[in-house]
């Protein structure tokens, strides 16, 4: 199978390259931003014919300009979008518009433009396969089920080691404290988003757009052994468990969840202690934003959330605010912003620019 990887030098991108090698698929091309050393490693390992460097065209290979040219020339069967941040939205849009099945790791695509991308997906008769432990687990659980059998979806959160800790302790957390997630190997930003539960807010919104079910509950399962669950109308519950290895999600998306291919170790249940803990939305009010976004599709709400989160996480990294202020500032800006309707997906970049400008203006005093 011919595969194009967008964002190939990031954490998910590198794991995708590893899975492609193990499955003996063909990497026809990739894009990246500025990690030239990692890009050279991929070129030496798999020698794809087409490379697009977003930061400097002199590193391109057989491509002059943009993603459209990269897709047209490389002619992939599927596209993996592992681009980080809202820049990945355009990549998802182009992939679906080109009638390519999309293997999606970019969260912002669905959080900001889920309704719009779903419309394009239907029009082009393509499929979006998630690359994420929770959504991949749900996809696997739901693939042979009918919607009228489903009562509720459950996604789990680890709590990143800080769930229900004393406020005094949370206030003292530093950027370096949060970099080492207890269960997963992740980048810096997603490690922080895991600790604040913002990542779980994103995942609730993503789950709705992927499965068209609004009744979604988050629960804490500290070991990250159980990734998701489905509660059926007969009140039975099916849980999904795998090792804490994102390559399972990548392998599953590439094989369309056939459950026959194996590139990760089996789960040793005897070494795990599994316990579910309820999340109090009054103690963690950030979750209320997720359900507000679900009630108001085709609006700027998802964009506002991702933009303000990106901004305050950077403030935290620069030690301008403490850990607890991250979600305080997010909630304050989100609930006071005059949200707008998104009529056209091509408006999104302009709307994001305006949102980011409003955020920078409001919180400039914190960045001095």
Swiss-Prot record:
It is an enzyme of class 1 (oxidoreductase). Gene3D superfamilies: 1.10.1740.10, NAD(P)-binding Rossmann-like Domain. SUPFAM superfamilies: 1-deoxy-D-xylulose-5-phosphate reductoisomerase, C-terminal domain, Glyceraldehyde-3-phosphate dehydrogenase-like, C-terminal domain, NAD(P)-binding Rossmann-fold domains. NADPH binds at residues 9-12, 35, 106, 108, 187. Keywords: Isoprene biosynthesis, Manganese, Metal-binding, NADP, Oxidoreductase. Mn(2+) binds at residues 132, 134, 203. Its cofactor is Mg(2+); Mn(2+). One of its GO terms (biological process) is isopentenyl diphosphate biosynthetic process, methylerythritol 4-phosphate pathway involved in terpenoid biosynthetic process. Pathway: Isoprenoid biosynthesis; isopentenyl diphosphate biosynthesis via DXP pathway; isopentenyl diphosphate from 1-deoxy-D-xylulose 5-phosphate: step 1/6. It comes from the Bacteria. It catalyses: 2-C-methyl-D-erythritol 4-phosphate + NADP(+) = 1-deoxy-D-xylulose 5-phosphate + NADPH + H(+). Catalyzes the NADPH-dependent rearrangement and reduction of 1-deoxy-D-xylulose-5-phosphate (DXP) to 2-C-methyl-D-erythritol 4-phosphate (MEP). This is 1-deoxy-D-xylulose 5-phosphate reductoisomerase. The lineage of its organism: Bacteria, Bacillati, Mycoplasmatota, Mycoplasmoidales, Mycoplasmoidaceae.
